[in-house]
């Protein structure tokens, strides 16, 4: 072991066997990540829980009694945080987690293993919530190819589809929160969202790794499709 620049003991993984360099570096990063260790102590399923916690601490998005949708929810770190914040376990709020993958049970969270792109998904979601959602959030990341431009377009495309889903299930005044990666490719997405939301901004919580281009798009004050329709009508005149 050695100490890093903060004075903490740093774990190194010896090379050997068939472990690839990329796997070795990933394992070292996990072993030396304080958020990973804290997540284990706090009972969270992933370090991502602290990203949502830090964003919520700053912007106060999650309140008791709210209805929340967590897209691409597995393994469930964000759902755990949301359930605690809105009081889902005791019935005050509701959290519906959606993913193609299976997810272990989270107290107070309703899980649906489905594709949110399915045309029937918005209606099914409303039935599970008993109405619209106050917040739609997504920590999803698209599968990468290693080709930077292609990956950026895939990521933005995924967020665009999540935003379209959100526009079908959010209540007026609702919030959309989604992971993006810093690039010029999301400029058009920002423009689109500004038509439907009172405020749109990028935020980067401390729990996001410093060497990562990861950040989050936060859109608040959902106005529905009325603002977009009015703008389109004005442009057509």
Curated annotation (Swiss-Prot):
Enzyme class, broadest EC rank: transferase
GO cellular component terms listed in the entry, alphabetical order: cytoplasm
Keywords linked to the UniProt accession: Cytoplasm, Methyltransferase, rRNA processing, S-adenosyl-L-methionine, Transferase
Chain sites annotated for binding S-adenosyl-L-methionine: 76, 78, 99, 115, 139
Pfam families found in the cross-reference section: FtsJ
Keyword Cytoplasm: yes
InterPro entries according to UniProt: RNA_methyltr_RlmE, RNA_MeTrfase_FtsJ_dom, rRNA-MeTfrase_E, SAM-dependent_MTases_sf
Record's catalysed reaction(s): uridine(2552) in 23S rRNA + S-adenosyl-L-methionine = 2'-O-methyluridine(2552) in 23S rRNA + S-adenosyl-L-homocysteine + H(+)
Primary subcellular site in the record, as a coarse category: cytoplasm
Active site annotation, chain numbering: 179
UniProt-listed Enzyme Commission number(s): 2.1.1.166
Compartment annotation: Cytoplasm
Molecular-function GO terms, alphabetical: rRNA (uridine-2'-O-)-methyltransferase activity
PANTHER family listed in its UniProt record: RIBOSOMAL RNA METHYLTRANSFERASE, RRNA METHYLTRANSFERASE 2, MITOCHONDRIAL
Purpose: Specifically methylates the uridine in position 2552 of 23S rRNA at the 2'-O position of the ribose in the fully assembled 50S ribosomal subunit.
Protein name: Ribosomal RNA large subunit methyltransferase E
């Amino acid at each position: 072991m050695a100490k890093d620049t903060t004075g903490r003991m740093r774990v190194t993984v010896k090379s050997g066997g068939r472990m690839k360099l990329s796997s070795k570096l990933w394992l070292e990063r996990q072993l030396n990540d304080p958020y990973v260790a804290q997540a284990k102590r706090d009972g969270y399923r992933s370090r991502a829980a602290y990203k949502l916690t830090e964003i919520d601490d700053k912007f106060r998005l999650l309140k008791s009694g709210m209805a929340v949708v967590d897209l691409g929810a597995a393994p469930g770190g964000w759902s755990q945080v949301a359930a605690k914040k809105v009081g889902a376990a005791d019935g005050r709020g509701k959290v519906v987690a959606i993913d193609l993958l299976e997810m272990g049970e989270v107290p107070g969270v309703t899980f649906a293993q489905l594709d949110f792109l399915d045309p029937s998904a918005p209606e099914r979601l409303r039935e599970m919530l008993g109405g619209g959602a106050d917040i739609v959030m997504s920590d999803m990341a698209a599968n990468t190819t290693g080709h930077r431009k292609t990956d950026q377009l895939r990521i933005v495309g995924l967020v665009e589809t999540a935003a379209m889903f959100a526009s079908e299930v959010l209540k007026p005044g609702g919030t959309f929160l989604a992971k993006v990666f810093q690039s010029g490719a999301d400029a058009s997405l920002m423009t689109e969202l500004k038509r439907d939301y009172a405020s749109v901004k990028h935020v980067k919580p401390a729990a996001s790794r410093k060497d990562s281009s990861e950040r989050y798009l936060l859109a608040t004050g959902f106005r529905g499709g009325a603002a977009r329709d009015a703008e389109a009508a004005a442009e057509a005149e």
